[in-house]
């Protein structure tokens, strides 16, 4: 069974991070989508340590219980472990596009947006979720930021309340409204009754570099070198196998630091957390 600490060590061990020439990815006419797909493959290889393996699918099936895509989140679920949602951006000043899914503190099997295959991939009710955010200017991976959802996002009820308020506003217009997995659909908006209006949320969240700038000064990110950052609650860090914790704590150029972050549900409360950081020299 793999985990984030093992993935970090595997990423540190390789030197080539030019995703434009990454092996095992089919070419796409859409360059932006291509980099997103390539980052997903890169991270699968990081969790499975399959950077130099030709037949990756056999190993993937050993390590992952579910593999999704941009239309079927999450992007991957580690067997007996965490869910991973991959996001690609071109600069740290760019916000993260979450599209129609609000930020997740955890992944719940009851989530209407996940597929039946995802729900049935294991016997599970709730999973920790990692947002894996890669900054890829000019097709080269420069910053890899892993942040657990419960450090980054509020409880589902916070966002669901906003969704219900928006839906309530649409209902109150007196227009013909249909419930959907999005915010809704307004039917027959023109005199012929032939046009419908889909109403969907487009959720955007700030880059964690901005959110956690008190513990990760943006100026400390070295633009010319590769940087890797991971943030999790202290209790989560302690759940990793002892051998993985010892290995990463003893590794050159990796710093493991105790930090405090604001509770996403109550900023007056501080959470004991752990920051793992690798700055390539």
Swiss-Prot record:
InterPro entries: Restrct_endonuc_II_NgoPII. It catalyses: Endonucleolytic cleavage of DNA to give specific double-stranded fragments with terminal 5'-phosphates. One of its GO terms (biological process) is DNA restriction-modification system. Pfam families: RE_NgoPII. It is an enzyme of class 3 (hydrolase). The keyword Hydrolase applies. Keywords: Endonuclease, Hydrolase, Nuclease, Plasmid, Restriction system. It comes from the Archaea. This is Type II restriction enzyme MthTI. Its EC number is 3.1.21.4. The gene is mthTIR. Belongs to the NgoPII type II restriction endonuclease family. GO terms for molecular function: DNA binding; type II site-specific deoxyribonuclease activity.
């Amino acid at each position: 069974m793999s985990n984030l600490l093992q993935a970090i060590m595997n990423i540190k061990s390789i030197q080539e991070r030019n995703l434009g020439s990454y092996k095992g990815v089919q070419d796409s006419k859409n360059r932006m989508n291509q980099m997103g797909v390539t980052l997903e493959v890169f991270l699968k290889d990081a969790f499975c340590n399959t950077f130099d393996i030709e037949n990756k699918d056999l190993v993937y099936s050993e390590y992952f219980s579910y593999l999704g895509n941009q239309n079927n989140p999450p992007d991957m679920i580690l067997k007996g472990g965490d869910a991973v949602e991959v996001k690609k951006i071109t600069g740290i000043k760019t916000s993260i596009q979450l599209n129609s899914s609000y930020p997740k503190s955890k992944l719940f099997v009851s989530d209407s947006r996940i597929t039946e295959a995802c729900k049935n991939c294991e016997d599970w009710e709730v999973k920790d979720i990692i947002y894996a955010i890669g900054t890829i200017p000019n097709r080269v991976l420069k910053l890899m930021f892993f942040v657990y959802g419960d450090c980054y996002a509020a409880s589902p009820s916070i966002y669901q309340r906003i969704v219900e308020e928006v839906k309530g506003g649409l209902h109150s217009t007196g227009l013909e409204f249909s419930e959907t997995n999005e915010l809704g659909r307004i039917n027959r908006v023109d005199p012929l009754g032939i046009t419908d209006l889909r109403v969907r949320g487009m959720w955007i969240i700030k880059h964690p570099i901005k959110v956690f700038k008190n513990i990760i000064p943006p100026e400390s990110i070295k633009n010319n070198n590769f940087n890797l950052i991971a943030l999790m609650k202290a209790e989560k860090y302690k759940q990793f196998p002892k051998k993985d914790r010892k290995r990463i704590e003893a590794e050159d150029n990796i710093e493991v630091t105790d930090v405090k972050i604001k509770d996403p549900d109550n900023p007056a409360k501080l959470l004991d957390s752990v920051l793992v950081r690798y700055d390539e020299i």
